[in-house]
Structure formats: C-alpha cells, structure tokens
Amino acid sequence: MIIDFRARPPYKSFLKLSLYKPWRPLPEDPAEWGAFELGREPNITADAHDMDAFVKEMDDNGIVKAVLMGRHADDFGIVDNDELYELTQKYPGRFFPFAGINPREEGAVEEVERCISKMGFKGISVDPGWLNPPLKGDDPIFTPVYDK
C-alpha cells in the first residue's frame, strides 16, 4: 500500500501556496535555474486545479491514501483545517488530515483538541522554521501544544 505522506491537493487554501503559483519561464542557461526549478516538469493536474483529477492521478500511480498537512505559517501561507475536514468528507477514507497549528496563535491548544476530538484528525503539523520570526521545534512555546 502506498501512502503519500505530504500531499498538497488543488483545493481551496492549498491553491494560495507558492506551489500553485505560476512558474516563471525557465532560463535557457541551466546555471541560472533555482533549486525549485531543477528537474521540474509540467504538472497538468496541479495546473488544472481539479480535485477529481488529483484523486485519479493518485489512483493511476497506486497511491491509496494521502496525509494532508494543514499549515499556519504566518507569511508563508495558511491551509485551513476546516477545509482539510471537508476533503475527508468528500473522499471518505482517502485522506488523513493533520491540523496546521501555530503556537503563537491564541487558541492553538483548543484548535488541536477540536481537530483531533471533533473532526478525527490524526495529528498536527507545525512549521517552526516558517514562522515569523522562526522558532526551533523544541522552543518552550510548543510545550502546551505538544502536551495536548
């Protein structure tokens, strides 16, 4: 069984992440390519922003399930936890959501509780290095979230 552990489907707030923004044309000289351009190929499903095509692409590649990571990372984007839940309802048994949590946000611990207990999320996703300013994963501000 193949499980994609960090899928980013073409759905609502995911579409606001840089992953879905149009790519600049590749420079002719490969020496000018950036890290995200090396080996890049067009992704028709991502460009179409079509969830059914995304699920078909999973099927075509033998991917049975996928983990969806929420994100609450200040300047780098938010993937809404309620939207992750919507996907679990639209495609039952297909996706395992992890709640995006920012420990600096008021109500972070309550959001962990809501997502795990009320919506059946399987874990949490934190992006300490993407926060503004960045944190280390063992910063004491995370303790109440980790304890939950």
Predicted regions and their residues:
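Helix-coil boundary/capping segments in enzymes
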Residues: M1-K148
